[in-house]
Amino acid sequence: MAKEKKTNMAEGKMNETEWTKKICKILNNHLNNHLKKSKSTFHADTNVKLPYGTVIKDFDKNWNASYSEKENKFATDLVIYEEKGDRIIPRVVIEAKFKNVGTHDAITYGKKAVLHKNLMPALRYGLMIGSMEDRDLQWRLFEHGGDFDFMFCFKAEEPTEDEHKDFIALVESEIECSNNLEKMFGTKNTKSGIYCLQKDVKLH
């Protein structure tokens, strides 16, 4: 009995960074084995710094901008990316919160989402929350999380079988959305051949 109590205490000591790495490992196990394309592979990584902007120094007489060589970047908790040869395409960013999430978190992460997607319009951006016992997304996230493409709650540190299945399905659908957005934005100045665009809302 004492041994079991010690194990439970050890599980309870997991922090946000450790939990995010656990989820990243789960994703990589799936992506490496089940999600491959003929010329590309998919991977997940943590603490990746992505650009959100750069500084315009001045303009020439034709108003062509001269940019700073250094990009402004934000660290992101988890990134799922596609690797094509020597090129990397960020597909999905997932910010992480563990055991609690506040209004400030929703606003701050939402602002990051907007800035990153301004530079990478095909990027999907979401929030995952771990070890939330009631597993309900709180109202403050609906009120202040409008810039997220998705949000997902895990009841405990270790995903249940159903959570694992649902989360993987969510990530795969977001990768597909990113691919579709890339195709859509690639039709600029051409006939798109697209006759319908729908933005869906799903609640589980």
What is the role of each PLM region?
Residues N15-I23, K70-F74, V101-D105:
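Phosphate/oxyanion-binding active-site loops and adjacent basic polyanion-contact surfaces
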